[in-house]
């Protein structure tokens, strides 16, 4: 039977043993990829600077997911939070990677076994002796088991009752660590940034899954519903499974792009909205204001700003700045951050403090404009010098640094002032090493951007797949071209493989 490539899956349509086999093989491939990718990332990951060169700057994709579930140590003697360790235990990054590879190998062998021994008694209807699956019962079994796993994750792993807990941090991504989390049963549990909601929702959803699974195991569907939804057809299972997957993909794309407790910025990088709203800038200025209120000097107040917080307030860490098709990590774009130069404060010759307008997310170039505290333009870097009124030279702008490596240093040379004004458009100013990785200076997206793009793309594709297979299973008789005046009764569903000449025909 010669099948075109897009119809090859029909070979497992009426073959439960080999249908199981190909799904086990799929699990083997997924687990094998995860373990192999983890080992590759561990081979290239540099854990030496968790502040200025964190995992998301280095383009790590699977390490953040392991970390948020409680893995922080490596058999190489390092910890993701910095420093060294002597005993990382079995469940290190390498241990998790190895477990996935072992699982992959076992699933590979199981898939081969089920492919060879496909005709098992368990798949046969004892009354007819033909291949048959009790799909509503199988649905109940899967629902029950997934409910147990969901409940167990929320009640034991996340809470730390039997497990490490999960990664929890403050709203500004400064104090993150793995810790146990108590379930949040009140209204606060519905806040996407409250970690307790992860525990409570898994416990609640798991309980619901267990009860629903028991219901479907003990109650048979009504005949009309069974026939109306084509519950005896394996393509119905495919359609509804695709629906579950694309719905989940849309949900996680949203929680990743907009941010939530499940996607900490220390592991996946900041969101674009934190740049758009000046989220970190506002916190920095709040801290400076608090320092000045305690009679600290500007220099002292800025010196107490954590370098980690300042680094978040840099446009190069905005996942929307990198093009979707620019390959490579953020470090391959603008370089590896080496140090914070400090916060530049610009003043004109009258002593007014000036603020550089920051570049919006979707601009590649942006005019350098300096405004005063009231938003009035006082200086700029003009495009045409002949018509300039507010040039740095004419206005006499100077710059002084507070905090960072240039703390206390000031410049009045117009060329230097303009250089730092241009860099201040991009947020806090950092020294970046572009030589080490031969970085090209073009911004890249973070794993947050890749994950979102990938999951939205596949969700749209799977949405189409759900509609396609749902329509096929609901309207199979229509698509098969059955003539209402057909004089031969054809038993559809008993034999569905393409080109099968043995379908029973019986005169009416």
From Swiss-Prot:
GO molecular function: chlorophyll binding; electron transporter, transferring electrons within the cyclic electron transport pathway of photosynthesis activity
Mode of membrane association: Multi-pass membrane protein
TM segment ranges: 21-36, 101-115, 140-156, 203-218, 237-252, 457-472
InterPro entries, per database record: PS_antenna-like, PS_II_antenna-like_sf, PSII_PsbB
Keyword Transcription in annotation: no
Chief location bin: plastid
Subcellular location: Plastid, Chloroplast thylakoid membrane
A GO term from the CC aspect: chloroplast thylakoid membrane
Disulfide bonds: none
Family, as annotated: Belongs to the PsbB/PsbC family. PsbB subfamily.
Name of the protein in question: Photosystem II CP47 reaction center protein
Organism for this UniProt entry: Pelargonium hortorum
């Amino acid at each position: 039977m010669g099948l075109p490539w897009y119809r090859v899956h029909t070979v497992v349509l009426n073959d439960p043993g080999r249908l199981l086999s190909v799904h086990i093989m799929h699990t083997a491939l997924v687990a094998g990829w995860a373990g192999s990718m983890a080992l590759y990332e561990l081979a290239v990951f540099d854990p030496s600077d968790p502040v200025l060169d964190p995992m998301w700057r280095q383009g790590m994709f699977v390490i953040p997911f392991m970390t948020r579930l409680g893995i922080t140590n490596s058999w190489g003697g390092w910890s993701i939070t910095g420093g060294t360790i002597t005993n990382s235990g079995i469940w290190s990054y390498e241990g998790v990677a190895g477990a996935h590879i072992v699982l992959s190998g076992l699933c590979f062998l199981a898939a081969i076994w089920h492919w060879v021994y496909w005709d098992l008694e368990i798949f046969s209807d004892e009354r007819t002796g033909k291949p048959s699956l009790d799909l509503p019962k199988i649905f109940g079994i899967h629902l029950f088991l997934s409910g147990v796993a969901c409940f167990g994750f929320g009640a034991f792993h996340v809470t730390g009752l039997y497990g490490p807990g999960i990664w929890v941090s403050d709203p500004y991504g400064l104090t993150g660590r793995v810790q146990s989390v108590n379930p949040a049963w009140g209204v606060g549990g519905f806040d996407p940034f409250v970690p307790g909601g992860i525990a409570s929702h898994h416990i609640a959803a798991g309980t619901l899954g267990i009860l629903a699974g028991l219901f479907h195991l003990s109650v048979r569907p009504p005949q009309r519903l069974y026939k109306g939804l084509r519950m005896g057809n394996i393509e119905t299972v495919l359609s509804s499974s695709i629906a579950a997957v694309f719905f989940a993909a849309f949900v996680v794309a949203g929680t990743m792009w907009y941010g939530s407790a499940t996607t900490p910025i220390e592991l996946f990088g900041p969101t674009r909205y934190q740049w758009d709203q000046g989220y970190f800038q506002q916190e920095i200025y709040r801290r400076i204001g608090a320092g000045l209120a305690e009679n600290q000097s500007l220099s002292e107040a800025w010196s107490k700003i954590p370098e980690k917080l300042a680094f978040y307030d840099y446009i190069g860490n905005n996942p929307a700045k990198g093009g979707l098709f620019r390959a490579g990590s953020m470090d391959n774009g603008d370089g590896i951050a080496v140090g914070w130069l400090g916060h530049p404060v610009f003043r004109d010759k009258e002593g007014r403090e000036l603020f550089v307008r920051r570049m919006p997310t979707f601009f590649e170039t942006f005019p350098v404009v300096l405004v005063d505290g009231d938003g009035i333009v006082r200086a700029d870097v003009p495009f045409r010098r002949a018509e300039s009124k507010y040039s740095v030279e004419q206005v006499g702008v100077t710059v002084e640094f507070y905090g960072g490596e240039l703390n206390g240093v000031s410049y009045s040379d117009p060329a230097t002032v303009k250089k730092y004004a241009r860099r201040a458009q991009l947020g806090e100013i950092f020294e970046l090493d572009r030589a080490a990785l031969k970085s090209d200076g073009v911004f890249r997206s973070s794993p947050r951007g890749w994950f979102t793009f990938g999951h939205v793309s596949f969700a749209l594709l799977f949405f189409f797949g759900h509609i396609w297979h749902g329509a096929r299973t609901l309207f199979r008789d229509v698509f098969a071209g059955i003539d209402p005046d057909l004089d031969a009764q054809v038993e559809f569903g008993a034999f569905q493989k393409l080109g099968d000449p043995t379908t029973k025909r019986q005169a009416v």
